[in-house]
């Protein structure tokens, strides 16, 4: 067998084994050294391949796809800095427990550490952020094919295990790289036996089930029975089924629920926006929780952590579906690794309903509405609120970091009885790759997605706009343009004008309308809340991607946030004094 033949077979069995493991979505960036892998993936009848000129965009797209599906996409790139461009998304995938599979092509052994062109130290490049990193040898008939299949199967099981995360396979190839016609009857494959005639993977790993132990459920039920004022917190939850189970638990036990925007429950009609209530120190003091059940991961807002430090609950119990530590405020007294859905359902069957629950705060909703009248200019606050009210229940929502995710968490209104798939990159909370992540999320959901994003995040990933023309589902991109880093206006450094604007405000003065034109994307810039509502309704009903720009001034936005929040606090304080 000649070199071209073994290289072709080598690449084919890698792709074939991934497909047999139901890993069929490939994000490919053009490159020479990765030619064997690219051709194998492109020619396979059961793969879906999307091409990305930019590796960073490819990796964030794969991240968004994983958030939507719970399954990894496969990243294929050439040698050199290509694999390094995946790094930010790999970090987010690792911190956010999202599966991802990187196949980086590399120069062969004899070219490494020699000064050869486009050759870097790729093996292990992601360090501790990779769940597993492995070097595959150059294609050779001396290597049994079952060794390759076994490595692929282990890579798949590792990236999808608990905790899920990125896995990196670095694969060296010698020239020539061009494939030859595939020979599935090659003698090299004869040792595989039944694999050749079946469609099953070479080996399977049966994942450990994270069903709750009855002792854990009984212990939490016992503590719950003795609690006078328990509280449920829904933190970051990826799966709607988990979110629904937590909501059902809150309802069946009549326990107040704090639903973070990352929980998928914040927009649900049966939740109460405790984010707004907790602006008031009096409200927090008068609603002290002595037991807190925290389901899922981290929270967007700071108020729960501050409340925990004030309350010092007798018991703070975290239930999460992974073994990683979660104790940002060091108040956790018990941590349980189990399926969130299974634990919530078991606890609902074991426990008795509580006697009281936090009252709805409808007056607070009315106060926010007063600041978001239809004839008023559209603001950062009203944009988030209007999106939360008008988003199609059959669509998805992706939120950029910095102010968009915070405004949606604080000021959103309840939209209906359907759980709207909601995603954000809160593992490491970077502002990079947001458009790509939202595009991947939409692709995985196979439904339209609304993206709420700031101007700096938009600029950071603007090259991803070229991906959207080939999308089968559209994005509605709402860009909050306050000409800089608006969140820094809320920090103490904003009081030092000699350094603030240049180093933190960072005005960019770029033209979003021109960017939309350059990428042939529909664009609107509505001036009022009524006009924005009309524009958003039209965009969400369109089959094409569109950009809606919301222009804002950072100083006015800061003043509005302070004025509205103080108005909410005053009303809440009056309620608590009655």
Swiss-Prot record:
* MF terms (GO), sorted A to Z: 2-succinyl-5-enolpyruvyl-6-hydroxy-3-cyclohexene-1-carboxylic-acid synthase activity; magnesium ion binding; manganese ion binding; thiamine pyrophosphate binding
List the coiled-coil residues: none
SUPFAM superfamilies from the UniProt entry: DHS-like NAD/FAD-binding domain, Thiamin diphosphate-binding fold (THDP-binding)
Q: State whether keyword Metal-binding applies.
A: yes
Q: Its biological function?
A: Catalyzes the thiamine diphosphate-dependent decarboxylation of 2-oxoglutarate and the subsequent addition of the resulting succinic semialdehyde-thiamine pyrophosphate anion to isochorismate to yield 2-succinyl-5-enolpyruvyl-6-hydroxy-3-cyclohexene-1-carboxylate (SEPHCHC).
The similarity annotation says: Belongs to the TPP enzyme family. MenD subfamily.
Which protein, by its recorded name, is this?
2-succinyl-5-enolpyruvyl-6-hydroxy-3-cyclohexene-1-carboxylate synthase
Q: Which organism is it from?
A: Prosthecochloris aestuarii (strain DSM 271 / SK 413)
- Gene behind the chain: menD
